[in-house]
Amino acid sequence: MFAFLRGELVTVSREEAVVEVSGIGYLLHISSGTSRRLPPEGSQVRLFTHHYVREDAQQLFGFLDEEELQLFRLLLTIGGVGPKLAMAVLSGLSVGEIQEAIVANRPETLYGITGVGKKTASRIILELRDKILKIQPAASGKTAGAPQALQLNEDALAALMTLGFPKPAAQKAISGILETSPGLSVEEVVRAALIAIHNNF
């Protein structure tokens, strides 16, 4: 719904920020890392956003850079990981530290984070390691194509879920397609995923 918000930073705390845009104050949930990096209240700021919608609530999550936003969205693809836990992960470690722990298969680094147990840490590594390696072979956090690859995965996943397919089946199909054919567009990935899902039924 919103790609980003640009406006005056009205208030900021460890977990929330209010940004005023054209007279409207938007409440955004943020990581502690983003909170530390924000400019003083009253400054102009731009935050990338993720609009989370469920039956009983709507929430906006804010990020200073696209890399943190895309990792947040990747975490949401894991069963049992909601936005609150994803934010806890991003608050516990930097994006680079999380990626390094995933690539190096170090679950103990992740289960030191509040709310992340051994099973959840292992699941994060199991489900995200190949994705991180694919978009970031050196695990340096500086691969130019990383945000685009993560966005493609997110867009294809959203399209399939809109069509009524469950997230686990959709993500499995997308991951398999991106592994064998990394240069496809979103539309091509969705078409190939539809074929793969139907063939598995």
From Swiss-Prot:
Residues 144-154 are annotated as: Flexible linker. The lineage of its organism: Bacteria, Pseudomonadati, Chlorobiota, Chlorobiia, Chlorobiales. GO terms for biological process: DNA recombination; DNA repair. Residues 1-64 are annotated as: Domain I. The RuvA-RuvB-RuvC complex processes Holliday junction (HJ) DNA during genetic recombination and DNA repair, while the RuvA-RuvB complex plays an important role in the rescue of blocked DNA replication forks via replication fork reversal (RFR). RuvA specifically binds to HJ cruciform DNA, conferring on it an open structure. The RuvB hexamer acts as an ATP-dependent pump, pulling dsDNA into and through the RuvAB complex. HJ branch migration allows RuvC to scan DNA until it finds its consensus sequence, where it cleaves and resolves the cruciform DNA. NCBIfam families: ruvA. It holds the Pfam family HHH_5. Has three domains with a flexible linker between the domains II and III and assumes an 'L' shape. Domain III is highly mobile and contacts RuvB. It is found in: Cytoplasm. This is Holliday junction branch migration complex subunit RuvA. GO terms for cellular component: cytoplasm; Holliday junction helicase complex; Holliday junction resolvase complex. Homotetramer. Forms an RuvA(8)-RuvB(12)-Holliday junction (HJ) complex. HJ DNA is sandwiched between 2 RuvA tetramers; dsDNA enters through RuvA and exits via RuvB. An RuvB hexamer assembles on each DNA strand where it exits the tetramer. Each RuvB hexamer is contacted by two RuvA subunits (via domain III) on 2 adjacent RuvB subunits; this complex drives branch migration. In the full resolvosome a probable DNA-RuvA(4)-RuvB(12)-RuvC(2) complex forms which resolves the HJ. Residues 65-143 are annotated as: Domain II. Keywords: Cytoplasm, DNA damage, DNA recombination, DNA repair, DNA-binding. Residues 154-201 are annotated as: Domain III.
